[in-house]
Amino acid sequence: MKTGDKITITVLTDKHKAEFTAPCLVDFEAENIYNIPLTLKGFKDNADKFGFKETVLPAITSFGFKVDGNKGKLLNNKLVWNSSNNPEFNNVTEYTATIKGSTISHIIPYLYDFKLKPTFTVSKGSKVYVGEVEQKSGETEVDFTRPVTYTVKSGDVEHDYTVSITNTGLPVVVIQQSQSGDFKEVTTGGLWGIGAKTVNKFVDFMVRGKDTEWVEDDQMTIYNADGTVDLATANCGVRLRGNTSQAYPKKPLAVKFKDKQAVLGMPKHKRWVLLANWLDHSMIRNSVAFDLAHLIEQAWKNNASIGEGIPWNVHGQNVELVIDGHHVGNYYLCEQIKIGSKRLDINDAYEDVKADGLVEATLENCGYLLELDNNYDENYKFITSHYSVPFMFKDDVLDDGIFNQVKSKIQGIEDNIYNGNFTAAYNDLDINSVVDQWFIWELTMNHEFLDPRSVYYFMNGNGKLCAGPVWDFDRATFQNVTNAKNQGSSGDRLKPYDEWICWSANPKSGLTSSNLDNGTSCIFYPALIKDPIFQAKVKERWAVMYPVLMGLEQTIRAYGKSQAVSFLFDSAMWPTNKAAIQKHKNNFSDWSGDENINSYPELIENFVTVYRNRLNGMNTLITSGRFTK
């Protein structure tokens, strides 16, 4: 380019296009880069000389989606937490996107059908195109699975916009309840009905109570984050679940399919659970705890010399839940703990053996899933004599002989532990699974094995009593001790990183169903932890598992990315500040210590730090041989 040559320059901004022509004042040399400072004012002030022309670019001035124009795809309501610390649904008629420069974006958290008809306005005299197809506001359907380029044209001037309509990046579960079954109110609390709380009312619609008969004409569909179908619409029954948690405003649900279904890559089964995680500000405590259990399983499977541990633990995935046309936030969809070839693979439960009618049910050919829980609310149950541990059969055992044989075996184990005959106890108690379960409870800082609550054991025929699977980690686990103390936690609700939780146990003998809460047995662990055989087994298994468990930090950070967008919506719908929680759970003081962290990256860093501190604290306790105070 030589002196005197004409240079035509075009300058584009978000809203304007400027063009002018100027002469070259110097010779440009090849293979050189020239930086030329440019101020438009001088050219604009001498428009005739330089042929300066400024054009206002055609623009999209508003962009959104009307609910009526996208029926069956967009919900007409939004869950909000009001100033009275109660959830409510507000009416929604339109979703309005954000326009920033040449980018238009909006997040619809539950979106699973990306073919939508947008409503938009443009600058006067402009037309809008996607490719070569002219777009009509409120009429033209567009697939927003991927970002779409909208071109606005006015004469020979055009302006491109990139439109991104996304969800949270999680699968979307859609449930539609039928009208069949029992929706009558289930109440708790109050005095003579005054002040009672309806536990099966979900904000402003009803779900069936946990003890109602299953129906088979509810429907569930599951969509992947990209809108593809993971589970085509399947018949099922949905009802409330949980003990304490059923009274929380964000309702946990149980699902039973009419036919076995594979869900999100998990094996086919009829029984599934949707955990609400209302008290878990991070939304991932259950996810991380089950991942921890799987790492422990992986460790012993890769090191046969230390022996087998818990053979199966729950799998699941965080999802967005839509039920009866309401988006209710982030849930953990997971396998329910059940006996079966794809779950806890032991002999069939007594009821199933009897129902099959192929053989006579005996102690040896039945499997027994046992829950240890102070709620003590199953049909077949007993309390041990020395430590008052409540054992409940999850499946009815109608044969008194079999029931008494299982009870006698477990009581015999406790007798031997109580009398210091640990070798004899381990003839009937699987020490490997008991150690592994203890690792999980202690690492997650889960207070509930003290009571105990939601603790599972099992027996396969007349085999050993085994610990597991593990369950229920949403409340006050992975605790930031300092923050929890500042929130109001005290006593055994605080769990220092360098002490054993089971040191806080207060086992008592002779308790009954009416006063189980007077003691905290912590099952058999306060006695086991003093046994040299148990201590040696702990050290042996920990040496193999500790390096594997260090990798859990990466898993937590990965959740920090995958759950970040969902957190923005869920934390707004279900805040976990002190006032919000205590409005629905009087005098609650079992804090995790992250409830007031509003930045998800900071919350995840807190989670990682807490886990690292607890892992290191346990490593020091074990390697130094400190098992007693």
Label the predicted regions:
Residues T3, V11-P171:
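Beta-rich interaction/scaffold domains
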Residues D218-D226, S287-G307, N404, S408:
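Zn2+-dependent metallopeptidase catalytic core
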Residues K256-A262, P267-M283, L295-W300, W312-V314, ...:
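Internal "kinase-insert"/substrate-recognition segments embedded within catalytic cores
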